[in-house]
Amino acid sequence: IQPPKTFSSLLFSSLLFSSAAQAASEDGSRSPYYVQADLAYAAERITHNYPEPTGADKDKISTVSDYFRNIRAHSIHPRVSVGYDFGGWRIAADYASYRKWKESNFSTKKVTEEIKDNYKETKTEHQGNGSFHATSSLGLSAIYDFKLNDKFKPYIGARVAYGHVKHQVHSVETKTTTVTSKPKGGTPAGGPVIKTDPSKPPYHESHSISSLGLGVIAGVGFDITPKLTLDTGYRYHNWGRLENTRFKTHEASLGMRYRF
């Protein structure tokens, strides 16, 4: 009776060893290198802080236009990453380019006054165009994966990035003067005399900043296959400041991570 038990034990042990060896082989065949592609929805926050009237910087003249005071913009952009998985910890380098934010405004101001025997109307028209563009962001992240089970892996991390932000402003102001003579006695009012000329030369300015910014990231990875992971994530990034203008982004993303 003993030999069959011994044979069964040996057979079971050999099968168990074979399965473990195969699993180890499959796990060992997974490269630590990976690439990831994401589509991100970004909420961009541009805040223009003016100096206090009694503060130390009260006399400082800003080169950043008032176009960029408390802007709330949104954009969708792609992002690509390459990384290395240490088994629990990952590092990744990423690159993204954002959509240019643009704004135009038009204003009209009319002033009417009496000058001797005439009515004088002065109309001032202002046309302004502004743009703010986070042209590029090159970042490096350190990420920690929480392995809840074989499929779901929440993660958190920190990111440092080199970003380039620039803005441009162009404005034109035109003044139109209309003079109409008053009626006198039985004489009707005279026809208007109109004169149009630029009240100010066209104005243009362009400034940019390149600096290191800091951010945090979090998300959840779902392993579809041993090599393919669906990733949903959030990241916050502070781009730094261009004088008294701060630029920050909140991003939600969906992407795929492929391990070689």
From Swiss-Prot:
Keyword Transmembrane in annotation: yes
The keyword Nucleotide-binding appears for this protein: no
One annotated GO molecular function: porin activity
UniProt superkingdom: Bacteria
Low complexity: bias regions: 174-186
Keyword annotations of the record: Cell outer membrane, Membrane, Transmembrane, Transmembrane beta strand
InterPro entries: OMP/PagP_b-brl, Opacity, Porin_opacity
SUPFAM superfamilies reported in the protein's UniProt record: OMPA-like (SSF56925)
Chain intervals for the UniProt region annotation (Disordered): 173-205
Pfam families in the record: Opacity (PF02462)
Family of the protein in this entry: Belongs to the opacity porin family.
Name used for this protein in its record: Opacity-related protein POPM1
Gene assigned in the entry: opr
